[in-house]
Amino acid sequence: MNTLKMELPDKSYNIYVGSGLLSRVDEYFNLNRKVFILTDSGVPIEYAEKVKDCSKEAVIYTIPQGEDSKSLLVMETVLKAMLNFDMSRKDVLVAVGGGVVGDLGGFLAATYMRGIDFYNVPTTLLSQVDSSIGGKTAVNLGGIKNIVGAFHQPKGVLIDTDTLKTLPKRQIAAGSAEAVKMALTSDKELFELIENCGITENNLEEIIVRALKIKKFVVEKDEKENGLRKILNFGHTLGHGIEAEKLGELYHGECVALGMLYMCAPEVQIRLTSVLKKLGLPVDYQYDIDKALEFVIHDKKCQNGVVEAIFVPCIGQYEIKSLSVEEFKRLVKERTGEI
């Protein structure tokens, strides 16, 4: 087992990574209080039940699987369920699932009674390597991803790698995009490991831990995304636009993969294309580039007509460039061959 510690001025917490951790979750989390367990219909129910079995008093609430559950409507329904469970400010929410459950669960915890504790138990590769740590919580509104939210750090994170054994191959592939993202901007050796060996049962925990160490370092330096943390948006500026344009046809990680391709130097793009293909991620997918770019204008990363885009000039390094919307559109269209 690996234990990392996120060290922040106001709230530090441990991140536990290993096999078989879920069955003894009470060794890592304080569950000696009321525990509201949030999961979704795509997550094997036994994961939530393991948390319940280790809790003093718990209830499991299941939301529908998918991005549509990251909404204010679903949020209101869950808040009412928390209220009906008579939760106090001393009680805790445990999010058991992927990025949707973690994002919604964290935002619920941030807003219920002005803030309660929550623990993250990510069960997808994407959430394990990225979204489960760092404190970003949000829901979608009006077709815009993560536009309503708050920074609310978890009390702890438990990553049981055994949960990945039940994931479909496509979801594993989608999650691997976030590990590639971390490697491209910050860890040349990690990229070469994935490039040469892929992601296998033998190197899975190492890749998760190395990706988490990158994000941990970045968040500790810039918790509220005033500077350095923007590098974690690599692939997401255009990726979010593609995701909105395709309306659930593609997974988030697949859109990030497509979004990364055109933000690299040509020689990096060649190697990245090969890696994405090896991992089972799309490198050539039909989407309406104009519609995708329109969504970019409304993204959080676009402020006052300026898009802050992350580029990778060589593997393990990054550049943050401020471009006008028109400059960004022209660049993307040139690189995708649209003009």
Model-derived features: positions:
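Residue-level signal for inorganic ion chemistry
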Residues: 18, 37, 122, 160, ...
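Glycine-rich beta-strand-to-loop/alpha-helix junction loops that act as flexible
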Residues: 65-66, 96-98, 234-235
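Short glycine/serine/threonine-rich phosphate/pyrophosphate-binding segments
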Residues: 100-107, 128, 240-241
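A glycine/threonine-rich phosphate-anchoring loop and its flanking beta-alpha core
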Residues: 14-16, 107-199
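Active-site segments that bind and position negatively charged phosphate/pyrophosphate groups
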Residues: 193-291
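C-terminal charged capping/lid subdomain of soluble metabolic enzymes
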Residues: 177-179, 269-339
